[in-house]
């Protein structure tokens, strides 16, 4: 199964991050990479003018960088996490 660049998949990624107590917000800003992660506050801000594809790639990049423990992942998100780390 490949990653589908749809709003539904974007929502799955947002819910995955929220299950680890991160807040995902879409706002305008001048981020060099298109997003900003406030690790201490567990807040993720993504440029709201990104396309759906850009938002998904940003979310995937963030998930890969924040050291999510797959063992503590809720069952409903394990499939999504495995898909991300497979690619």
Model-derived segments and spans:
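A near-ubiquitous, low-amplitude feature marking generic local secondary-structure context
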Residues: 7, 42-46, 64
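Active-site scaffold of zinc-dependent metalloenzymes
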Residues: 20, 28-53
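Post-HEXXH active-site segment of zinc metalloproteases
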Residues: 33, 53-56, 66-87
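Auxiliary, metal-adjacent structural segments of Zn-dependent hydrolase domains
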Residues: 1-32
């Amino acid at each position: 199964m490949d990653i589908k660049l749809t709003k539904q998949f974007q929502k799955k990624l947002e819910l995955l991050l929220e299950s680890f107590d991160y807040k995902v917000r879409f706002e305008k800003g001048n981020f060099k990479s298109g997003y900003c992660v406030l690790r201490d506050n567990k807040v993720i801000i993504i440029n709201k003018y990104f396309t759906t594809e850009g938002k998904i790639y940003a979310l995937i990049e963030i998930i890969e960088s924040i050291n999510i423990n797959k063992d503590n992942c809720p069952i409903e998100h394990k499939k999504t996490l495995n898909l991300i780390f497979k690619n």
